[in-house]
């Protein structure tokens, strides 16, 4: 089989697991946490006459898939190489250039957008981490998917939906009909939480060495999850050396970065017990997929008397992108695994026997390591100047203003994004330091723009097409006056905000289009597909799915709009 689907690192242990999960044997197992309608006979819900004429109507199961860091650039590069699941999806409705319109192109803000229909300014999820000076603990840095009241140590946080301000599609489905079930599965807790929302029935994410759930979800672990965790425990006792797919030979080229580290030649090998490297191997996404397809059958999703929602976030593309960049053999091998995993999900949905709609997109884009990009003609590709770090700037300003060096003047996670002034300083001093910091940062050759919170507060909310938004408007879409920093710093294009490549060599998070643009693909069997190259927004996904489910939205209730998925004179959107 000469395709991306075929690559020899798909181990026998997973093949047997996949068979065990998707066959009907699991459907005979009784678990305590099942829905009252789980015993509904499979296939009893027949397609209505309306469904027969309009494949988008009568949906019993919505499946929303996010591929972490799957940029429009990656989609463009590999869409002609896909031979399986990703190729099949391209028979659907394809938006190759959808925009995360906001500036903070990180995992948590991006996932908060996908199924809420709102920009981060409304969801409240302005970054993966920010500073909340109202929390009682000493460390004021908070994680987007934690409840800080439950832990004094942010390194030992309790995953929670606490910070998400708005409802998700799943929350709206549950409000419309409490019998709807919301199941969320992901490699990252923040992805599962932000896509699932406030009312998940089942939520599973990778944590340390197994798939786990939220502390307040007390039901019995499904057989599917238990089986996958047992499989992980067994195969992690052995070394693994994945074999690179033959189609990736043209991407294999050695690149030396950092302290003589070599990347680009082959997918990562893993030693027994190395759970960190596990996240950049095919096993990471494959086990997440195994849980998703297993729960489709075990919970009989779509077979109740109300539509169900399954959200899936595949996190390995992001892990590979951070560790190796986007243009080496590592990412090519990862794309092969993605193609296979999507094929398995589609096969499970087809076997499930109920009408479904699948949407695939991403939480943000990404860019390659600057060292390789520069070799390939991107002359502006570079790493950030260490002098732009908040600590370095604090020291310089402390000298200028004759302030103590015992505490930082500014707090920030990295040079780009939100910067917070030290709240213990006098008000007049804070105002002077904010203006001084803005001036110094703005004059740095790697900085594109610096906005104060006051400036962003007074900027009108943008309404034009997202590719036309200026930097201030992009920052505005990520700005929450109660959570955002006193300064928002945007670096120039192709400046990687990692000064020294160690474990992370590449990243995202900028306001530039390579981080903002992602594909959106809507797919349902037997529907006429089309491609629309004109830009749309990721906030448009939720209103489009809500329309298919006939869940009404008031004008202006969300930032997104319904996308018409029917290429004929008929429409899948509410008639005005």
UniProtKB/Swiss-Prot annotation:
Disulfide bonds join 108-144, 248-332, 562-573. It comes from the Bacteria. Keywords: Disulfide bond, Hydrolase, Metal-binding, Phosphoprotein, Signal, Zinc. Gene3D superfamilies: 3.30.1360.150, Alkaline Phosphatase, subunit A. The keyword Hydrolase applies. Its EC number is 3.1.3.1. The active site is at residue 107. Residues 1-32 form the signal peptide. It catalyses: a phosphate monoester + H2O = an alcohol + phosphate. Zn(2+) 1 binds at residues 68, 107, 363-364. The keyword Repeat does not apply. InterPro entries: Alkaline_phosphatase_core_sf (IPR017850), Alkaline_phosphatase_prok (IPR026263), Phosphodiest/P_Trfase (IPR002591). Zn(2+) 2 binds at residues 318, 322, 508. Its cofactor is Zn(2+). Substrate binds at residues 128, 188-190. It is an enzyme of class 3 (hydrolase). GO terms for molecular function: alkaline phosphatase activity; metal ion binding. Binds 2 Zn(2+) ions. Monomer. Alkaline phosphatase with broad substrate specificity. Has phosphatase activity towards nucleotide and sugar phosphates with a preference to nucleotide phosphates. Has no phosphodiesterase activity. This is Alkaline phosphatase PhoD.
């Amino acid at each position: 089989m000469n395709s991306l689907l075929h690559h020899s690192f798909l181990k026998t242990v997973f093949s047997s697991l996949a068979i065990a999960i998707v066959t009907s044997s699991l459907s005979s197992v009784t678990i305590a946490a099942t829905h009252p309608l789980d015993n509904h006979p499979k296939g009893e819900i027949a397609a209505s006459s309306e469904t027969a004429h309009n494949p988008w109507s009568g949906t019993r199961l919505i499946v929303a898939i996010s591929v972490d860091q799957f940029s429009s650039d990656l989609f463009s590069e590999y869409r002609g190489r896909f031979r399986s699941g990703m190729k099949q999806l391209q028979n659907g409705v394809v938006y190759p250039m959808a925009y995360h319109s906001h500036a903070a192109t990180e995992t948590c803000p991006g996932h908060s957008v996908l199924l809420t229909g709102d920009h981060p300014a409304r969801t409240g999820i302005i970054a993966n981490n920010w500073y909340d000076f109202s929390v009682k603990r000493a460390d004021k840095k908070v994680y987007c998917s934690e409840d800080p009241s439950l832990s004094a140590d942010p390194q030992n946080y309790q995953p929670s939906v606490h910070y998400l301000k708005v409802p998700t599609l799943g929350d709206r489905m549950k409000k419309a009909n409490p019998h709807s079930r919301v199941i969320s599965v992901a490699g990252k807790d923040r992805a599962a939480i932000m896509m699932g929302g406030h009312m998940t029935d089942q939520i599973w994410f990778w944590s340390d060495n197994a798939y786990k759930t939220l502390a307040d979800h007390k039901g019995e672990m499904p057989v599917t999850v238990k089986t996958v965790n047992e499989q992980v425990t067994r195969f992690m006792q052995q070394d693994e050396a994945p074999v690179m797919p033959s189609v990736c030979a043209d991407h294999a080229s050695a690149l030396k970065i950092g302290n003589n580290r070599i990347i680009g030649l082959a997918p990562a090998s893993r030693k027994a017990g190395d759970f960190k490297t596990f996240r950049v191997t095919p096993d990471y996404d494959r086990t997440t997929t195994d849980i998703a397809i297993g729960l489709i059958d075990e919970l009989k999703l779509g077979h109740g008397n109300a539509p169900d929602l399954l959200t899936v976030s595949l996190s390995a593309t992001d892990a590979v992108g951070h560790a190796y960049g986007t243009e080496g053999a590592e990412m090519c091998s990862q794309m092969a695994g993605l193609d296979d995993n999507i094929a398995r999900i589609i096969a499970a949905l087809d076997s499930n026997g109920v009408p479904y709609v699948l949407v695939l997109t991403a939480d943000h884009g990404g860019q390659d390591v600057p060292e390789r990009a520069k070799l390939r003609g991107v002359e502006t590709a570079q790493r950030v100047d260490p002098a732009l770090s908040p600590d370095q700037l604090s020291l310089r300003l402390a000298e200028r203003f004759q302030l103590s060096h015992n505490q930082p003047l500014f707090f920030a996670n990295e040079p780009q994004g939100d910067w917070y002034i030290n709240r213990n300083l006098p008000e007049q001093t804070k105002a002077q330091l904010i203006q001084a910091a803005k001036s110094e940062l703005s004059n740095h050759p790697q900085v594109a723009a610096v906005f104060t919170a006051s400036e962003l507060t007074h900027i009108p909310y943008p309404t034009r097409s997202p590719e036309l938004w200026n930097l201030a408007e992009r920052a505005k879409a990520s700005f929450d006056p109660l959570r955002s920093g006193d300064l928002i710093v945007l670096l120039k294009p192709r400046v990687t905000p990692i000064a020294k490549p160690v474990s992370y060599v590449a990243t995202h998070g900028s306001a530039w289009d390579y981080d903002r643009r992602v594909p959106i693909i809507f797919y349902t069997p037997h529907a006429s597909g089309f491609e629309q190259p004109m830009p749309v927004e990721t906030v448009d996904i939720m209103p489009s799915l809500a329309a298919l489910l006939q869940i009404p939205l008031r004008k202006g209730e969300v930032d997104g709009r319904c996308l018409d998925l029917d290429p004929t004179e008929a429409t899948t959107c509410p008639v005005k």
